[in-house]
């Protein structure tokens, strides 16, 4: 394969513990990021926004999303469904059951790469 082409196996990617209830595995390209995010039932991803466009595809389980700065919209995304979040849209999510979600970001989430994603630890 040319040097710029890379092949990955999820089983070879280290799992990063984000909180007691959330962990993730990341694969990053030049212009996008692919993440497996594992959430235990009732895990909370606190409200945040980012300049990255996001696609969330639920492989197993379900997430209850609250969209907007004042939580104006609610969406439940279940296994086999996809949610598109444009850039800079405030959102939070709670796992309705143990969940595996696949997130795609463009460009890659620099805060996830350098550990500055402090919104996970807001009280």
Locations of the language-model features?
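Short acidic-glycine-tyrosine-enriched beta hairpin
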Residues: 71-87
């Amino acid at each position: 394969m040319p040097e710029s082409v890379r092949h990955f196996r999820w089983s070879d990617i280290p799992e990063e513990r984000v909180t007691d209830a959330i962990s993730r595995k990341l694969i990053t390209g030049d212009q996008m990021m692919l993440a497996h995010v594992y959430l235990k039932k009732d895990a909370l991803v606190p409200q945040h926004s980012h300049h990255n466009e996001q696609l969330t595809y639920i492989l197993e389980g379900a997430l209850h999303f609250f969209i907007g700065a004042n939580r104006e919209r609610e969406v439940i995304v279940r296994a086999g469904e996809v949610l598109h979040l444009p850039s800079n849209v405030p959102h939070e999510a709670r796992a309705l059951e143990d969940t595996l979600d696949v997130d795609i970001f463009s460009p890659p989430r620099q805060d996830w790469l350098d550990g500055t994603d402090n919104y996970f630890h807001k009280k």
